[in-house]
Design a protein with these regions (language model features):
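DNA-contacting surface of Y-family translesion DNA polymerases
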Residues: 138, 145, 153-299, 382-383
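Short Gly/Ser/Thr- and Asp/Glu-enriched loop/turn motifs at secondary-structure junctions
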Residues: 61-65, 101-104, 245-249, 298-302
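Residues that scaffold, gate, or flank divalent-cation-dependent active/transport sites
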Residues: 1-63, 67
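Short acidic, glycine/serine/threonine-rich loops at helix termini
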Residues: 1-4, 106-114, 181, 198-203, ...
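Catalytic palm subdomain of template-directed nucleic-acid polymerases
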Residues: 68-86, 161
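Acidic, metal-coordinating catalytic segment for phosphate/diphosphate chemistry
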Residues: 266, 273-384
Length: 384
């Protein structure tokens, strides 16, 4: 979640609900739009693909942030940063800022200053900033604005007299490790220019993937829950296949709202699959093991699945005792191909393939067009 410079200038708070802004919408020229995650994801993928052309070392940190490994002197890297910024703006149409430094923590700070200081023109190389100005910039930044420092941690640091980024950079690393953690000690060292946080080129190599969301309208029937689980199984299959992974264990869960303690229910089930798989049918079948534990009439406000014990597809033994013929059917790739061609929700597993958004999905009545992924939402131009 973020705000544009224009929103900040109007004094709009981060996460401020629309109903508070609506009375002044016309005066301020505001237009309400629903979250368009499909468009965001596609634009993000385009940006990351473009950035990957500039370096063999790319870590996609989040939907709107990436780290790249680069080499060169400050002048060369500033030119590279400007080239990346210009290319993303020209080819994708979104503005980006570039922060360059010898450590990831300092690169984050350089990016922040590039974003907020017009003098940098969107690209800041830490080593090109004079030492006295570096200190002034760090002294003017609260420690809570530092990467990985939470509100709770900030309070503990403040109690020790550490209020700014400069204060933390000057702190004794060993004392920080003993009082807090080795993670924060690494941050101190990174602020001093010692690389401690490596570039993670394959962040998907994790232990688990979770697909879960709260419902706009509670689900109170096993049939409704079956649709939810089928959709999540299909999403999990696509994500696993995209990164060349298979799952050995699937956990499905549901929960009522904590605001309704009278009908509290939190069923869950853990299924160990015979073999690691990314097949959507097998994942859905495992998720459906939750259905006998769903109480008819109870209003469930949230559900999801978690796949764990993830393994690279290439590591599967060719002479396994238990063969898995389902992977050869190619159902997952087929679903993805149809979805790419006709749009998300155009095909699915059983009830998950029902056309049109179910009642429980997030309400997005003011959705902007998904120009890059839906043919039927492209603008039409008529020539007279």
């Amino acid at each position: 979640m973020t705000r544009s410079p224009e929103a900040k200038a109007l004094g709009i708070a981060l996460g401020e609900p629309w109903f508070k802004l609506a009375p002044r919408a016309k005066e301020w020229g505001l237009v309400a739009k629903s979250s368009n995650y499909e468009l965001y994801g596609d634009i993000s993928a385009r940006v990351m693909e473009l950035l990957g052309r500039y370096s063999a070392w790319l870590e996609v940190y989040s939907i709107d942030e990436a780290f790249l490994g680069v080499r060169g002197n400050p002048e060369e890297l500033l030119l590279l940063g400007q080239a990346m910024k210009t290319a993303v703006r020209r080819n994708v149409g979104v503005p980006v800022c570039v922060g360059i430094a010898g450590t990831k923590t300092l690169a984050k700070l350089a990016n922040k200053w590039a974003k907020h200081n017009p003098a940098f023109d969107g690209v800041c190389h830490w080593d090109s900033v004079p030492a006295d100005r570096q200190e002034r910039l760090m002294a003017g930044l609260s420690v809570i604005e530092l990467w990985g420092v939470s509100t709770r941690l900030t309070k503990r640091l403040n109690a020790l007299g550490i209020h700014t980024v400069l204060d933390l950079a000057r702190a004794d690393p060993v004392r920080i490790r003993d009082r807090f953690s080795v993670v924060l000690m690494r941050t101190v060292l990174e602020l001093r220019g010692t690389p401690c946080i490596p570039l993670e080129e394959e962040r998907i190599g994790r232990d688990q993937l979770i697909f879960s969301r709260s419902f706009a309208t509670p689900i109170s029937t096993p049939a409704g829950m079956r649709q939810v689980l089928g959709i999540y199984a299909q999403q999990a299959s696509a994500r696993l296949a995209r990164h060349g992974l298979q799952a050995k264990v699937l956990t499905a869960f549901a929960a009522t709202s904590h605001y309704n303690p009278r009908d509290s229910s939190h069923p869950s089930v853990c299924v160990s699959l015979p073999m690691p798989t990314a097949d959507p049918v097998l994942l859905a079948r495992a998720a459906y093991a939750l259905l006998p534990r769903i109480d008819d009439g109870v209003k469930y406000a949230r559900a999801g699945i978690m796949v764990t014990d993830l393994r690279p597809t290439a590591n599967q033994a060719p002479l396994a005792v238990f063969e898995n013929p389902h992977e050869e059917r190619g159902i997952g790739p087929l679903l993805e191909e149809v979805s790419r061609k006709y749009g998300r929700g155009s095909i699915g597993l059983g009830h998950a393939g029902i056309r049109g958004g179910p009642d429980w999905t997030m309400k997005r009545d003011m959705l902007s067009p998904r120009y890059t992924t839906h043919w039927d939402e492209l603008p039409v131009v008529k020539a007279a």
